[in-house]
From Swiss-Prot:
Keyword Chaperone: yes
Subcellular location, record wording: Cytoplasm
Keyword presence, Cytoplasm: yes
Pfam families reported for this sequence: SecB (PF02556)
Keyword field: Chaperone, Cytoplasm, Protein transport, Translocation, Transport
Subunit structure: Homotetramer, a dimer of dimers. One homotetramer interacts with 1 SecA dimer.
Name of protein: Protein-export protein SecB
GO BP terms: protein folding; protein tetramerization; protein transport
InterPro entries to which the protein is assigned, alphabetical: SecB (IPR003708), SecB-like_sf (IPR035958)
One cellular-component annotation, GO: cytoplasm
Protein role: One of the proteins required for the normal export of preproteins out of the cell cytoplasm. It is a molecular chaperone that binds to a subset of precursor proteins, maintaining them in a translocation-competent state. It also specifically binds to its receptor SecA.
Organism: Roseobacter denitrificans (strain ATCC 33942 / OCh 114)
Amino acid sequence: MAEEEEAKTEANGQQQAPQMRVLGQFIRDMSFENIMAQKGAPSDAQPDVQVQVNLDAKKRTADNQYESAIKLNVTSKVKDGDATLFVLELDYVGIFHVDNVPDEQLHPFLLIECPRMIFPFLRRIVSDITRDGGFPPLNLENIDFLSLYRNELARRQSSEAPKMDA
C-alpha cells in the first residue's frame, strides 16, 4: 500500500521527502596529548578551553553514499598563563546513504544535517577521552551547524570579493 502511494506521488510530479540513513561512524584520526603530565606539573590550574570545528564531506564510490566529517581541535591552557594543559584532535566521520535531496541542497545537507546526527557520539568520545586523560570530562556545548555553515559561506564570499582601491 505504501508503495502504491509512492508511485502515485512520483506520477503526480511531486518530489519525495529527503531520506538519510547512517550506515556507519568511526574515528578516522585522534590524538590526545596530556601536556601537564608530560611536564610533571600539577593539573589543579583553572583551564581556558578553546574549541575549533571544521566540517568536510565527500561522495563515496557507492551510489548515494557520502562521508561527513567533523574535525575537532580542542586546546586547554591555564587561564592566567601560557601553559598548555592538554590538546585533543579528533576527526570523526559518519557514512550516510542519502536519497531524494536535490543537487543544489546536497552540500548544505551534508554539512548541516549529517554532522548534527553524529555529534552526540563525538561529544561522548571527547568527554571520555578528557576524563580518561586525567581531567574533568569536557562536555561540549551543542554546535549550531547551520550557523557554522553560513559563516563559512560568508567567509568564502568575502575572500573572493574583488578588492577596491582607494
